[in-house]
């Protein structure tokens, strides 16, 4: 949906909506992020129960990322003919179905089917969530609405992994996934009662399909920036996906202590998202370069000092502080280089991020199973270093700076 269509929708009184509707979308965002990364905290019991390796269990994140890529690229053509409320309700229902399928999966194949379904929801929801929030409130309240929706995302990054690990020890990994179903049902009922009917607006000329979205890559500096962000997320998730087995097999952390370490990562990440805006305002590209450099250093140090629990907790806290806040910077970059096509650029960025998560978690899993954690962490560091170099090239390119 184009900016012109959104402006028309915002001017339509019957689509003014309510803050309750925005809150409903925020709850949906929380459940979705929790669903996406819940396997990170439950890889070991999932692998043991399904009779597979931890690396193969980690492919549940890879497949969700792959399907999110496809959905984010093609959702605009589908959304153009569907009422936005209907589409959101359908995606929310599918999220609940995914949690149930994974929780009841009798084998690895069904587990992967459930993860593929959540990938479809991820791609569809994030590609249209901002545009939908913009239709629910007056124009001057849009920033607050978007912050509220992203607040659900930020909250999930804090509590999802440690809560998942704790629930896994309490009621098993299947019970942890099953807990997502009532949350999805609450979000579904909330959206059903609070969201107004949101008819698809007239499609204005511009990047409205997958082919013209790819044309954005021809703009100066855009390809470099997308490659830099892609390698950043690949490096991040090739390591982060396998934090739990690393903690258990190398650091010697088990049970509830795993939950505490994951809570440290999430809490540090939440703090990072609160602080990053000020840092970006002062030194934008310097910050985007420094983050992957620091994370690469952390990955390398973990290969040497991974057996020291106190040091590992501090290092992973720094990893969460920097890694969770980095997407804020890259979204700000999107706004800079696509001032007139922010929605199309955002859709392309969603595809890049999800593809990178899929590739990173896949590569990390293959290395973890075949050669051990050190190869995984070395690969992560290498990708992060290349990301930093490409970010420097992006800063020196002729991309618009807003």
Curated annotation (Swiss-Prot):
Presence of keyword Transcription regulation: yes
Domain of life: Bacteria
TM region positions: 22-42, 60-80, 86-106, 108-128, 147-167, 170-190, 220-240, 256-276, 296-316, 318-338, 348-368, 375-395
SUPFAM superfamilies (alphabetical): MFS general substrate transporter
Example of a GO biological process term: transmembrane transport
Entry's family note: To B.subtilis YwfA.
Protein name: Transcription regulatory protein OpdE
Subcellular location per the Swiss-Prot or TrEMBL entry: Cell membrane
Keyword tags: Cell membrane, Membrane, Transcription, Transcription regulation, Transmembrane, Transmembrane helix
Membrane topology: Multi-pass membrane protein
MF terms (GO), sorted A to Z: transmembrane transporter activity
Record bears the keyword Transmembrane helix: yes
Described purpose of this protein according to its UniProt entry: Regulates the expression of oprD which encodes the imipenem-specific porin.
Any Pfam family: MFS_1
GO cellular component, one term: plasma membrane
């Amino acid at each position: 949906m184009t900016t012109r269509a959104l402006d028309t929708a915002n001017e339509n009184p019957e689509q003014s909506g309510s803050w309750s509707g925005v809150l409903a979308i925020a709850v949906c965002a929380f459940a979705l992020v929790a669903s996406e990364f819940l396997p990170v905290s439950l890889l070991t019991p999932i692998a043991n129960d399904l009779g597979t390796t931890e690396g193969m269990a980690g492919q549940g994140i890879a497949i969700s990322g792959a399907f999110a890529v496809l959905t984010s690229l093609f959702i605009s053509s589908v959304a153009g003919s569907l009422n936005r409320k209907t589409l959101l309700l359908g995606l929310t229902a599918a999220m609940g179905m995914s949690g149930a399928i994974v929780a009841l999966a009798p084998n690895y194949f069904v587990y992967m089917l459930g993860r593929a379904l959540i990938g479809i929801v991820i791609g569809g929801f994030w590609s249209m969530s901002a545009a939908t929030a913009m239709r629910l409130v007056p124009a001057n309240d849009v920033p607050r609405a978007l912050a509220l929706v992203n607040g659900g995302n930020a909250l999930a990054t804090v509590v999802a992994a440690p809560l998942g690990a704790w629930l896994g020890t309490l009621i098993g990994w299947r019970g942890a996934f099953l807990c997502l179903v009532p949350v999805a049902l609450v979000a579904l009922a909330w959206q059903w009662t609070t969201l107004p009917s949101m008819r698809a607006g007239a499609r204005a000329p511009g990047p409205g399909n997958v082919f013209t979205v790819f044309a954005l890559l021809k703009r100066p500096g855009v390809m470099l920036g997308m490659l830099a962000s892609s390698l950043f997320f690949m490096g991040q998730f090739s390591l982060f996906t396998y934090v739990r087995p690393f903690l258990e097999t190398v650091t010697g952390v088990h049970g509830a202590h795993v939950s505490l370490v994951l809570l440290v990562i999430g809490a540090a990440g939440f703090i990072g998202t609160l602080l990053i805006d000020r840092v970006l305002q002062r030194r934008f590209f310097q910050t985007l370069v420094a983050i992957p450099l620091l994370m690469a250093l952390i990955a390398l140090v973990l290969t040497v000092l991974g057996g020291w629990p106190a040091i590992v907790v501090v290092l992973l806290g720094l990893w969460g502080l920097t890694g969770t806040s980095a997407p804020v910077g890259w979204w700000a970059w999107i706004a800079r280089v696509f001032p007139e096509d922010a929605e199309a650029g955002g859709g392309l960025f969603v595809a890049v991020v999800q593809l990178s998560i899929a590739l990173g978690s896949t590569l990390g899993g293959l290395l973890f199973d075949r050669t051990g954690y050190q190869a995984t962490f070395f690969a992560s560091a290498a990708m992060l270093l290349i990301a930093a170099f490409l970010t420097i090239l992006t800063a020196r390119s002729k991309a618009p700076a807003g």
